[in-house]
């Protein structure tokens, strides 16, 4: 069930972030991404605490990405890591370039 749930969220052309609402790194990730002009429907924050099987979801994220911590940021079907990875990518200018290339920004 956790595998199907996670896989149903990860889609080409979309940015998906798996979060826990109380996590400060998740909030920082949400703040950064929410400032960008995404096209409607191409940015999704998935609260794994609402799914009810948090530990199973994190176990599957570990299997899929090598880490079970949140946030887990997917650009298209590729996991780019967590908050620090996203911030570093943004500071290097790579985030905007990548999002423009995939057509996610207005």
Curated annotation (Swiss-Prot):
Instruction: Give each disulfide bond as a residue pair.
Output: 23-26, 79-83
Q: Which UniProt keywords apply?
A: Acetylation, Cytoplasm, Disulfide bond, Electron transport, Redox-active center, Transport
Q: Where is the protein situated, by its record's location annotation?
A: Cytoplasm
Q: Which PROSITE patterns match?
A: GLUTAREDOXIN_1, GLUTAREDOXIN_2
Keyword check for Disulfide bond: yes
| Main location, first listed in the record | cytoplasm
Q: N6-succinyllysine (modified residue): where?
A: 9
Taxonomic lineage from the root: Eukaryota, Metazoa, Chordata, Craniata, Vertebrata
What is the protein's known function? Has a glutathione-disulfide oxidoreductase activity in the presence of NADPH and glutathione reductase. Reduces low molecular weight disulfides and proteins.
* GO MF, one example: glutathione disulfide oxidoreductase activity
Query: Which Gene Ontology CC terms are recorded?
Result: cytoplasm
The record's section on Pfam families has: Glutaredoxin
Q: Which residues carry this modification: N-acetylalanine?
A: 2
What is the protein named? Answer: Glutaredoxin-1
**Family under the similarity heading:** Belongs to the glutaredoxin family.
Is the Electron transport keyword given for this protein? yes
Per the database record, which ranges form the Glutaredoxin domain? Answer: 3-106
């Amino acid at each position: 069930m956790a595998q199907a749930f996670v896989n149903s969220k990860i889609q080409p052309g979309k940015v998906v972030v798996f979060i826990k609402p109380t996590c400060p790194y998740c909030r920082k990730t949400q703040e950064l991404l929410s400032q960008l002009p995404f096209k409607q429907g191409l940015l999704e924050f998935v609260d794994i605490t609402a799914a009810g099987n948090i530990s199973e979801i994190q176990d599957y994220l570990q299997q899929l990405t090598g880490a079970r911590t949140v946030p887990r940021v997917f650009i298209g079907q590729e996991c780019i890591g967590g908050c620090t990875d996203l911030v570093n990518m943004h500071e290097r200018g790579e985030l905007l370039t990548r999002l423009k290339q995939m057509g996610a920004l207005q």
